A protein has these predicted regions:
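A contiguous binding-surface segment within folded domains or other stable secondary-structure elements
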Residues: 32, 54-58, 133
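Extreme N-terminal, non-catalytic leader segments
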Residues: 1-19, 24, 56, 134-138, ...
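Short, acidic/polar N-cap/turn motifs at the starts of alpha helices
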Residues: 11-13, 50, 107
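Short active-site oxyanion
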Residues: 41-43, 116-117
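Short solvent-exposed loop/turn micro-motifs enriched in small/polar/acidic residues
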Residues: 5-7, 46, 102-103
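Conserved nucleotide-sensing/catalytic segment adjacent to the nucleotide-binding pocket
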Residues: 44-98
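Glycine-rich phosphate-binding P-loop
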Residues: 17-39
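Conserved NTP phosphate-binding and transfer environment spanning the P-loop NTPase/kinase superfamily
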Residues: 86-143
């Protein structure tokens, strides 16, 4: 997957202790659901459904378009106000449309205007919010 910056993307983003996690996928793939799980664990919402990706000081950042409310859509409930931050430094991409085929996969990356962002293929992954939260708070190890 390749994304250009600056741009507005159909995605959801949360901040976990200073690490921005951009959640991408088709409509109905579970982007907002994952974000809700991460918020329940302590993450803050950056933006739901649309995210502005920009380069500032040679780093990728994500912010909420000014036209969007500071809330998240909960299917079957409606729009709910949650804890938000105005922007975050992008550290991870979670791809809700792609399956991690291997138990211990090689590192995957998403190219965003020449920046390689570590990417987790998350379709059909159990306990997804817990896994993403732990990864965002720590580092992956290469053996």
């Amino acid at each position: 997957m390749e994304i250009k910056a600056p741009s507005t993307q159909h995605a959801t983003c949360v901040d976990i202790k200073g690490s921005g996690v951009l959640i991408v996928g088709d409509s109905g793939s579970g982007k907002s659901g994952l974000a809700i799980g991460l918020i329940a664990l302590g993450a803050s919402l950056v933006a739901d459904d649309q995210c502005e990706i920009l380069i500032e000081n040679d780093k990728l950042h994500v912010s909420k378009p000014k036209s969007l409310p500071e809330c998240i859509e909960m299917r079957g409930i409606g729009l709910v106000s949650v804890s938000t931050v105005s922007r975050t430094q992008l550290k991870w991409v979670v791809d809700m449309d792609r399956v991690a085929e291997e138990r211990m996969p090689e590192f995957k990356f998403t190219d965003i205007s020449g920046y390689r962002v570590p990417t987790i293929f998350a379709k059909n992954m159990d306990d997804l919010a817990f896994r993403i939260y732990v990864v965002a708070c720590n580092e992956l190890s290469e053996f």
